[in-house]
Amino acid sequence: ALKKVVETYHPDRILIEPSGVGKLSDVTRAVEGVAENLPVILNSFVTVADVNKVKMYMKNFGEFYDDQVSHASCIILSRTGNASEEKVAAAVALLAEKNPTATIVTTDWTVLTGAQIVSVMDGKRDLVAELLTEARAATWPMRRG
């Protein structure tokens, strides 16, 4: 199916979501097999994690959830806009324990542009530094007075 999509549509990007209890590592292996014969580059492995359910999912879905977290190059936390700092920090700690090298996006995704999310997924931007720079620039005139 992936080969047909690539050859028919020539997409710039293909997103594959391992639904249900699929493993990210299995999806990655399958795509790597197809990539041997097609112009396909695996450049990011992203997991979206609900900040309110990380602990519960680790407990209830164990191997499958841990596989998605441990094989991700980027983990985007959802529902952070209404979560406390403590809840976000606890989720980050649990995720970082399973995958200390992944970029973990904690910014409420409703304030991020699609381009910012793609850049972070691709490992091309330091979103924290960028948002801090924007915040400083927005408050700079207020500090002068």
Language-model regions, residue ranges each:
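Nucleotide-state-sensitive switch-loop elements of NTP-binding domains
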Residues: 1-58
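Conserved nucleotide-binding/hydrolysis micro-motifs of P-loop NTPases
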Residues: 20-23, 51-55, 80-84, 109-113
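Short amphipathic alpha-helical interaction patches enriched in hydrophobic/aromatic residues
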Residues: 35, 76-80
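Short, well-ordered beta-strand core segments
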Residues: 45, 75-76
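Charged helix-capping and loop-helix junction motifs
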Residues: 60-63
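C-terminal accessory "lid"/substrate-recognition subdomains
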Residues: 67, 71-74, 82-145
